[in-house]
């Protein structure tokens, strides 16, 4: 149990460094772009699945 607490503490420290730095804004923009790309890919594969039936 102590091992998990230490692991999550280290993850929280790393997230705080990224969150309080300027990296968070850049990562959010990249995440938005990736979100829209994957939505388009999902819709294309959905349409291809419907057309093949």
From Swiss-Prot:
Q: Which domain of life is it from?
A: Bacteria
Supply the InterPro entries for this chain. Answer: DUF1328
Keyword Transmembrane helix in record: yes
Q: Which UniProt keywords apply?
A: Cell membrane, Membrane, Transmembrane, Transmembrane helix
Membrane spanning stretches: 5-25, 30-50
Location relative to the cell: Cell membrane
Q: Which GO terms describe its cellular component?
A: plasma membrane
Membrane topology classification: Multi-pass membrane protein
> Does the record carry Cell membrane as a key word?
yes
Major location (coarse): membrane
- NCBIfam families on file: PRK13682.1-1 (NF010226), PRK13682.1-4 (NF010229)
- Membership in a protein family: Belongs to the UPF0391 family.
Q: What is this protein called?
A: UPF0391 membrane protein Bcen2424_6479
Whose protein is this, by species? Burkholderia cenocepacia (strain HI2424)
